[in-house]
Amino acid sequence: MTSSYVGRFAPTPSGYLHFGSLVAAVASYLDARAVGGRWLVRMEDLDPPREVPGAQQAILETLERYGFEWDGAVERQSERFPAYAAVVEQLLRSGLAYACTCSRKQLEGFAGIYPGFCRDAGHAREDAAIRLRVPELEYRFVDRVQGEVRQHLGREVGDFVIQRRDGFYAYQLAVVLDDAWQGITDIVRGADLLDSTPRQLYLQELLGLSQPRYLHVPLIVQPDGHKLGKSYRSPPLPAEQAAAPLTRALRALGQRPPAELAQASASEALAWGVAHWDATRIPRCATLPEERL
């Protein structure tokens, strides 16, 4: 079976894959393969100072050990900086973006909503971040799992950074450009990125890019409420007996694998997942406690 579906898994090499990463990878892989679609891997290595040496290779080796097979070459955002730079220049020339010299201290107390201090200041680009002007509009989309999401960009976000003061490019810009460049039709990822999706919709609209379908899976959280992640020293995935974590990930996604699947090979566990994938079973919630899985 062939399909126009193109999905992707885009890990950040600031650490190794953990169980939360696996849940997102399984969801994106099965959603693509269940309809005969393509599944790409992209390294979101936008922030070299935070990258852990050897993490990129370790991530790819883990995916292989866990039975994942991707299509095409692995793309890296660090190789796409000229494309990002061209769009930043375009937005600056058109007056849709501007230089911002605000420090973190100046922005304390604004709950992450940019108050517009530099919007009409006319600062030079040197030693400044670049922010995108946002409209006083509400953006909405229907997530395949989380349902309708609404966000007023002006009131809830404010003008947001597309290039940092240190010269590195912001995730919001890079992810929109790369998804369009790679022809991604369906984005399956963790619910921690649900809130940033309206900013991406605005960028897509501004740049005349097509809008993918979105599916945000619940985040796996630790007993203290923090998501499983590299920042909280979540343990890396075990190198052996991959079918057991894969089976657990299937259960986290609301699928119903037989108990004996945990003793199978990784490729058999994923093949079962492809054959039985039902995205409507994914829990409609933002978080899932790890201890309940």
Curated annotation (Swiss-Prot):
Zn(2+) binds at C100, C102, Y114, C118. Keywords: Aminoacyl-tRNA synthetase, ATP-binding, Ligase, Metal-binding, Nucleotide-binding, Zinc. Its EC number is 6.1.1.-. A motif ('HIGH' region) lies at residues 11-21. ATP binds at K230. Pfam families: tRNA-synt_1c (PF00749). Catalyzes the tRNA-independent activation of glutamate in presence of ATP and the subsequent transfer of glutamate onto a tRNA(Asp). Glutamate is transferred on the 2-amino-5-(4,5-dihydroxy-2-cyclopenten-1-yl) moiety of the queuosine in the wobble position of the QUC anticodon. PANTHER family: GLUTAMATE--TRNA LIGASE, GLUTAMYL-Q TRNA(ASP) SYNTHETASE. HAMAP family: Glu_Q_tRNA_synth. This is Glutamyl-Q tRNA(Asp) synthetase.
